[in-house]
Amino acid sequence: MSFTDPIGDMLTRIRNASSARHEKVLVPASRLKVRIAEVLREEGFIKDFVLHEDGVQGAITIVLKYSADREPAISDIKRVSKPGLRRYVATDSIPRVLNGMGVAILSTSKGVMVDREARKQKVGGELICTVW
């Protein structure tokens, strides 16, 4: 478990569980992680998630999504902005992931959102990760 990069830890758990064809994955909770899970659900990369409150930190159970032949909905998920090297992008330099087939998740002043929404609202921010 990585205490220096909790978002990277969450993404790695999702990537590993997905490649091992697990149905669910449990990650420690935070507001940012919950919002990332919401974005992944809205974009159709995960089925659902459940937030477990325990009074301290809580946990998130993420239900992974697979096709009929058990191929994961998430082909790859990569951390872009890391604690040692933050990556911020302006509106005009938000990357297109696989020419629009994937999404980039950004943390902006208007909340956590995907690249299309950030371009539409004309906001830049920290490029958290890319998913396809």
From Swiss-Prot:
One of the primary rRNA binding proteins, it binds directly to 16S rRNA central domain where it helps coordinate assembly of the platform of the 30S subunit. Part of the 30S ribosomal subunit. Contacts proteins S5 and S12. GO terms for cellular component: ribonucleoprotein complex; ribosome. InterPro entries: Ribosomal_uS8, Ribosomal_uS8_CS, Ribosomal_uS8_sf. Belongs to the universal ribosomal protein uS8 family. This is Small ribosomal subunit protein uS8. GO terms for biological process: translation. It comes from Anaeromyxobacter sp. (strain K). One of its GO terms (molecular function) is structural constituent of ribosome. Keywords: Ribonucleoprotein, Ribosomal protein, RNA-binding, rRNA-binding.
